[in-house]
């Protein structure tokens, strides 16, 4: 079991039960999944770039991503239905906890001028979104071999019903929120 999963069961659950007065342990919010998404409009000019993106996301998350394709043709964006426009991967269970631990303790501190993540990025239903501008902050990416720097979005889906509960859960998991 990963460090973060053990910490959740042994330390975080009792603290959340005390703070929010849950009667049942199953009512305590938990992280259900983490979705890592890369959307790249440049893929229409350079189709070979999709392999690079897929390999990078696979090395970052430890899981092979799914290539996302355009649902409709949009003339203004010069895309046709079915064209590859990005990649995404959904992490659950053990790999999710390991990714979150690595994100909080290794990746986020490596971001230039990092002062914490915004507490305003909750969606109103207890889910949290982080946008990372440069994928090279992840330790698995070798900077020498990178041709193109791109950003990615990370969505943390929790079972919390309110943003306050989700904020407290992520804060106890070590997420560095700025004040």
Curated annotation (Swiss-Prot):
GO molecular function: rRNA binding; structural constituent of ribosome; tRNA binding
Gene Ontology biological process terms, A to Z: translation
GO annotations of cellular component type: ribonucleoprotein complex; ribosome
Superkingdom, taxonomy of origin: Bacteria
Keyword rRNA-binding (UniProt): yes
Alphabetized Gene3D superfamilies for the sequence: 3.30.1440.10
Matches recorded under InterPro entries: Ribosomal_uL5, Ribosomal_uL5_bac-type, Ribosomal_uL5_C, Ribosomal_uL5_CS, Ribosomal_uL5_dom_sf, Ribosomal_uL5_N
Entry keywords, A to Z: Ribonucleoprotein, Ribosomal protein, RNA-binding, rRNA-binding, tRNA-binding
Function text: This is one of the proteins that bind and probably mediate the attachment of the 5S RNA into the large ribosomal subunit, where it forms part of the central protuberance. In the 70S ribosome it contacts protein S13 of the 30S subunit (bridge B1b), connecting the 2 subunits; this bridge is implicated in subunit movement. Contacts the P site tRNA; the 5S rRNA and some of its associated proteins might help stabilize positioning of ribosome-bound tRNAs.
Quaternary structure annotation from Swiss-Prot or TrEMBL: Part of the 50S ribosomal subunit; part of the 5S rRNA/L5/L18/L25 subcomplex. Contacts the 5S rRNA and the P site tRNA. Forms a bridge to the 30S subunit in the 70S ribosome.
Family label: Belongs to the universal ribosomal protein uL5 family.
HAMAP family for the chain: Ribosomal_uL5_B (MF_01333_B)
Protein's recorded name: Large ribosomal subunit protein uL5
